[in-house]
């Protein structure tokens, strides 16, 4: 298996001249504003091959408090991936947080997140 790692502007994915079988987003989607999230999701659609899959982890609205990134409701994920995507799963999960970071205050067991798998339909 070959993996490609890129450092670039995630809002400029449509400018990338290559496509991939799979894309992993571990904690990026939840940092964007509504408008930027739409741009990001549109860009993701351009870099995934037909039949490709996006594996995504983002903070859940089920995580209490306000520390950390924006919380994303499940409905927002369903809406974001309603067009040009096939939602395979949106499941609750948790991030593992380093134990030595004492100033963080998240739920027992780690912050609640959504583990999402969406696919690009085959042509």
Model region roles, listed by residue range:
Residues 21:
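Conserved acidic residues
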Residues 27-31:
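Short catalytic micro-motifs in class I SAM-dependent methyltransferases
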Residues 1-18, 32-123:
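Class I (Rossmann-like) S-adenosyl-L-methionine-dependent methyltransferase catalytic domain
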Residues 24:
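A conserved beta-strand element that flanks and buttresses the S-adenosyl-L-methionine
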